[in-house]
Regions:
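N-terminal secretory signal peptides that target proteins for export/translocation
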Residues: 1-4, 302-303
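Short, threonine-centered small-residue motifs that mark membrane-proximal processing/anchoring sites
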Residues: 3, 7, 12-28, 259, ...
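Structural recognition of the beta-strand scaffold that forms the well-ordered cores
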Residues: 31-42, 69, 79-83, 129-134, ...
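Short Gly/aromatic-enriched secondary-structure transition segments
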Residues: 46-54
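Conserved SGNH/GDSL esterase-like catalytic core that processes O-acyl groups on lipids
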Residues: 54-151, 155
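Solvent-exposed, polar/charged alpha-helical surfaces in well-ordered, non-transmembrane soluble domains
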Residues: 69, 73, 113-116, 151, ...
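Mobile gating loops/cap/lid regions near enzyme active sites that modulate substrate access
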Residues: 179-197, 205-258
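C-terminal membrane-anchoring or membrane-association module
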Residues: 294-303
């Protein structure tokens, strides 16, 4: 009887060790792969069109690196960025008149073509890669702030996530829609806020298990409500108004009417990193549990 109990304890200890190893590996990413729009584009649109021009920084829709660049840097991994500024979640791109279901005048891609084009680069997928799938705002800009637009956008994102999982992706981060009603271009637009809420509700309800969701909406509201806590003195007007650039961009939440400053991207990247990295307390609890079981096992075997 004691032998059987001891064996059971050994199995428990082994299971906890496996769980700890799994959590550790989840944090040991070896690459970040990004799909999205101007919030993630690190120069893809610029390389093909020359947009956006200065004072936008090196093809970013900001005054410096964007969130996924800071995330990859913090995780000490290379970044494979397939995001294009203007991309909808579907076929087309807002930048050349495309929409969720069709290309525009110049064939600029949405997120579905981004994934298709990337397949030759990302397959076979490594188990240690982190995928970031973030999009949706351009769908509203092209098709309007309606539930139909949101439903299609969510379905597109779920499809991309599903395709990645079928290809073997084990770590996928899906940030939600920011509160578009807090951006300078749509400040006070209750419809923009309502559709942001609706979009996020539908997205969360349909995401497969194991996919990491980040609540961008709530975090943005937190920053706007107490900007000084995050180092911002201005949270509702753009640093760059299309003509002149403010003298202190690091104190602005928004670079232009729709995009955050690189200072804001640094902060958001830190939040993304927390979302995809196991808390140290998790390892502490597992370690304590294993130590306790080991002690019980020792007593049982010596009894």
């Amino acid at each position: 009887m004691q032998v059987r109990k001891a064996a059971s304890l050994v199995v428990c200890v082994a299971a906890m060790l496996v769980a700890m190893a799994s959590l550790a590996s989840a944090g040991a990413y070896t690459a970040v792969i990004s799909y999205g729009d101007s919030l993630s584009d690190n120069g893809n649109l610029y390389a093909h069109t020359g947009q956006p021009p200065s004072p936008y920084w090196m093809g970013r829709f900001s005054n410096g690196p964007v969130t996924v660049e800071y995330l990859a840097n913090s995780l000490h991994t290379p970044l494979m960025d397939f995001a294009w500024g203007g991309a909808t979640t579907g076929v087309g791109n807002y930048g050349d008149g495309g929409n969720q279901t069709s290309f525009g005048a110049h064939g600029l891609p949405g997120m579905q073509p981004e994934l298709s084009v990337s397949l030759g680069t990302i397959t076979p997928i490594a188990s240690t890669w982190l995928f970031v799938v973030w999009g949706g705002p351009n769908d509203f800009l092209t098709n309007g702030f309606t539930t139909a637009t949101a439903d299609t956008a969510v379905a597109n994102l779920i499809g991309i996530v599903g395709d990645l999982k079928l290809l073997g992706a084990q770590h996928i981060l899906v940030p939600g829609m920011p509160d578009l009603g807090l951006t300078p271009d749509y400040l006070g637009n209750t419809g923009a806020t309502a559709m942001s809420i609706y979009f996020n509700h539908e997205l969360v309800s349909l995401l497969p298990s194991g996919v990491i969701y980040f609540n961008t909406f709530n975090f943005m509201q937190e920053v706007v409500a107490d900007g000084s806590a995050f180092g911002f003195t201005n949270v509702n007007t753009p640093c760059f108004n299309g003509i002149t650039v403010c003298a202190n961009p690091d104190q602005y939440l928004f670079w232009d009417g729709f995009h955050p400053t690189t200072a804001a991207d640094v902060i958001l990247a830190g939040q993304f990193e927390k979302a995809v990295t196991p808390e140290p307390s998790t390892f502490l609890m597992l370690g304590t549990g294993i130590a306790g079981l080991a002690g019980v096992l020792k007593r049982k075997l010596s009894a």
